[in-house]
Structure formats: structure tokens, C-alpha cells
């Protein structure tokens, strides 16, 4: 009886519930595309490692260290797992050659660096076979809607609706330390729509574009490095 009374006097609750379920489904949908351009043969031995470094030379953005760590951590999972040297550990050990202002931009710069005995020795100590340069960022666009919050004698509440689109775009360039050459590039682009409906309490429905970009890129990189 109580349920019927509620639905009789507040039929909009049912509509809102259906709308929220629909939005949850939409928010969980992220479109991710992967492009691979191979320029050389690849493969890796059990005693060899990969280091993933974020590009941070751009004036308007930096590749987030959290994304770099995410890709590296996922590459250590499952079948054909890759040994990953943590970015900060590598940069600290190689100081000052891999700081943002001094890091090699081209393979010929790496070739010049490898003539330094200390650089070559530390590469050998880490067992580095490949350096992966990650470059990119996640951008939020197409914001729309509005939410207003009020406080009154009966309490506080927020009402309204907002949405936005997130686009995560990253490139991974793979350098072979053995041959001092660029052996390929993998690009990922993930897009998704996020929503923020508010009926008394705001309920964020977030598209996990960066997490999806990380997962897909890590899987592709692992296959690429293994020569699959």
C-alpha cells in the first residue's frame, strides 16, 4: 500500500529512476581506438626490462605520472608479463640525463648519451631493452547543463543536470636500446560522456576514459614488445 501511494503521488520518481539507470549505462560506455605503426622487429628476454617515461617538454601540458604508472603496472600482469623499471627510480638513477629539460628527444640523442660510460653502465644494470615514451593527456570538452544548490528551513538540496565529454589521447614511442632505433609507435584515443544528475543529491556518473586508455595501451604494448 505504501509503495502504491508513493508511486501514485510521485510518478516522477519512477521516471527519474529509469533515467538514472539509462545514464549509468551510457556513462559506462567508452569508445577506445588503438593504432599501431611498426618500424622494426621486437622481442624481449626474461632478463631484460622496459622503462616507461612520460614526455614533459610541452609548455601547455605534461604526461601525468599516474598514467605512466598505470600502463607499467598493467604490463606486469598476466601471461607474457614484462619486467618494468619504475619511472622515478630510473630517472633518479640516470640524473641528470633523463630530466624533462635534458631527456633525449630522438634516437640519435640516445645514441649520443650511450657514449657516456655511466649511462651505458646503468642501462646494463637495469637490463633495459626498450624505452617507451608516453606523450598525451586527457581533455574535458563540451560541458553543458547546470546544477543549483539551496539551503532552506527544510534542509539542503541540489537540482539540475550536467554533462561533459572526456577525450584521452596518448602516443607510445618504443625505442630499442640495443639497436638505438625507433621500432614503432602505438596510439590510443578513448572518448566517453560523463553525467551529473542532481535530485537533492548530485550523483556523478563518470566515464572511465583514462582507465580504458591505460588498459588497452598496456595490452597492445605488451604484445608489441613481445613481438606478437
What residue ranges belong to the model's regions?
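C-terminal/domain-edge helix-coil "capping" segments
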Residues: 29-48, 125-126, 138-143, 159-228
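N-terminal segment of the mature soluble domain
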Residues: 54, 58-140, 177-181, 185
Amino acid at each position: 500500500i505504501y509503495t502504491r501511494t508513493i508511486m501514485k503521488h510521485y510518478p516522477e520518481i519512477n521516471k527519474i529512476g529509469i533515467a538514472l539507470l539509462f545514464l549509468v549505462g551510457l556513462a559506462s560506455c567508452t569508445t577506445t581506438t588503438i593504432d599501431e605503426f611498426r618500424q622494426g622487429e621486437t622481442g624481449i628476454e626474461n632478463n631484460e626490462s622496459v622503462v616507461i617515461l612520460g614526455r614533459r617538454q610541452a609548455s601547455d601540458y605534461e604526461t601525468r605520472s599516474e598514467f605512466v604508472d598505470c600502463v607499467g603496472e598493467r604490463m606486469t600482469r598476466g601471461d607474457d608479463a614484462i619486467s618494468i623499471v619504475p619511472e622515478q627510480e630510473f630517472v633518479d638513477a640516470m640524473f641528470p640525463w633523463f630530466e624533462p629539460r635534458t631527456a633525449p628527444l630522438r634516437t640519435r640523442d640516445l645514441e649520443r648519451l650511450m657514449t657516456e660510460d655511466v649511462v651505458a653502465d646503468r642501462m646494463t644494470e637495469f637490463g633495459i631493452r626498450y624505452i617507451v615514451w608516453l606523450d598525451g593527456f586527457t581533455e574535458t570538452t563540451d560541458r553543458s547543463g547546470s546544477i543549483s544548490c539551496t539551503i532552506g528551513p527544510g534542509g539542503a538540496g541540489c537540482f539540475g543536470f550536467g554533462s561533459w565529454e572526456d577525450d584521452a589521447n596518448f602516443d607510445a614511442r618504443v625505442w630499442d636500446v640495443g639497436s638505438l632505433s625507433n621500432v614503432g609507435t602505438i596510439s590510443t584515443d578513448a572518448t566517453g560522456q560523463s553525467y551529473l544528475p542532481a535530485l537533492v543529491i548530485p550523483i556523478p556518473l563518470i566515464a572511465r576514459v583514462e582507465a580504458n586508455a591505460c588498459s588497452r595501451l598496456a595490452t597492445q604494448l605488451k604484445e608489441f614488445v613481445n613481438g606478437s
